[in-house]
Amino acid sequence: MTLRNKAFHQLRQLFQQHTARWQHELPDLTKPQYAVMRAIADKPGIEQVALIEAAVSTKATLAEMLARMENRGLVRREHDAADKRRRFVWLTAEGEKILAAAIPIGDSVDEEFLGRLSAEEQELFVQLVRKMMNT
């Protein structure tokens, strides 16, 4: 196996391990849903399209995810009165409750993996990933 193939193979394994751990600890909340809920909590009433980056998804996929979350009572969406194409999103009381319970668990899962690295290694890891993503 070439170094290039090995690196990406190991990254896939790492993400699969992290996802499996996440699903075990938070079976009712996907990582993208969690990220979107964190973004909404940081900016209540955020415009729906601004959540695309947090969800790491397309506009259509995000809209579907938010519709499912709305049906579960986690978020509330409202159209802009002046422009019906624009929607704004808030967490519901239930969404706030679920997020508050999920944050320490999500942080713990992330720390389980990142904690294997020193603080310097964590910073280098982030820098290298950003460099590879060209951001």
Curated annotation (Swiss-Prot):
User: Which parts of this chain does the entry mark as a DNA-binding region?
Assistant: 48-71
Q: Which residues form the HTH marR-type domain?
A: 4-134
Instruction: Please indicate if the UniProt record lists DNA-binding as a keyword.
Output: yes
UniProt cross-references to Gene3D superfamilies, sorted A to Z:
Winged helix-like DNA-binding domain superfamily/Winged helix DNA-binding domain
Pfam families named among the record's database cross-references: MarR
Tell whether DNA-binding is among the UniProt keywords.
Answer: yes
SMART domains per the UniProt record, alphabetical: HTH_MARR (SM00347)
Q: Which GO terms describe its molecular function?
A: DNA binding; DNA-binding transcription factor activity
Which keywords label this protein?
DNA-binding, Transcription, Transcription regulation, Virulence
Q: What does this protein do?
A: Involved in the temperature-dependent positive control of flagellum-driven swimming motility and cellular aggregation. Regulates fliC expression by directly interacting with fliC promoter.
- Would you tell me the protein name for this molecule? Transcriptional regulator HosA
Species annotation: Escherichia coli O157:H7
Gene for this protein? hosA
